[in-house]
């Protein structure tokens, strides 16, 4: 086992230096159910390690789409891996087995489970945190990522029983992207169902892999991206998964943009649609996925020139750009955050925003307030957050 870890460590460090990523087969001795020894028969991952100077210790398994009949391995694989590297996250692009090559459910579930288990089992050699491994997938790969998030305890009969398979396959976060979700609804993608289920297709089996029906409170926090214009995999898929997360108390965030066809990938050239990945990065940051940090409850009062701020916000932005940002609404001069949502300990930039209506002296000559003059005000300070002092009395003089 030690030799194996050293081998993966060498591969990972070499991959970080070269333009071409290293390739690792998930079952070195042969995948269960394989029909041959070619790449199409033996699932593998490409390793895209984050540069050491940027690495956060987080990682993602990336599942390209293609209707379970092909793999959009560039714009839904390589490009995504490079984007993750840019925010300090190591990426592992999964080449799973396809229905067009004679592989059907549960083979694909086994492949994504094995990828997550492999990354977690080799976390030390890869320089990542075994408790910060996410899964992202696009289109049919989005369905695969949603199966990883909901069926992580499923153990297909043909599953191997080596040391890697004893490791948890549950991802710590999931990001199904314009995903196929339902295999039974009118909005389902018929081609994905055909390729996934193959000759064993039945309504009962299709229901088993309709992941909106498989969400439980143990499903990991989930981020979803979708476009309303998508006519190939309609938005009802992503929405149904989001609503299932809400029903089960799973933290979830859905971004549904109006324009945009199916299969856009990152689409960074679009000034609007291309912002979705930035929202994903912010979400990961505030989940504590990029940088786990101790947080503290805090409450207090905010006043301007002696008068309580009637309506505003207070934001705690930590010095570490990867640590979570905390924000609270100020109402009637008061705010409160619990230990789960409060600021991280340490040096923090504090920003308070408020209505200029809270600042005396902005009245018109006849004594009435002018809405044109009531522009928002703000102030920013640096302070040290200490759990021993959970209250803050902030007095702003203007």
Q: At which residue positions do the language-model features occur?
A:
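N-terminal cap/lid segment of alpha/beta-hydrolase-fold proteins
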Residues: 20-58, 185-188, 216, 289-292
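C-terminal catalytic histidine-bearing segment of alpha/beta-hydrolase fold enzymes
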Residues: 48, 225, 235, 239-293
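Short beta-strand element of the alpha/beta-hydrolase
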Residues: 56-66
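Catalytic nucleophile-loop/oxyanion-hole region of alpha/beta-hydrolase
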Residues: 72-74, 78-80, 93-130, 268-274
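Primarily recognizes the serine-hydrolase "nucleophile elbow" in alpha/beta-hydrolase
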Residues: 114-192, 206-211
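Acidic catalytic loop of the alpha/beta-hydrolase fold
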Residues: 182-183, 229-233
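Short beta-strand/loop motif that positions the catalytic acidic residue
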Residues: 218, 223-226, 230
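Glycine/proline-rich low-complexity segments that form flexible loops, beta-turns, and polyproline
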Residues: 291-398
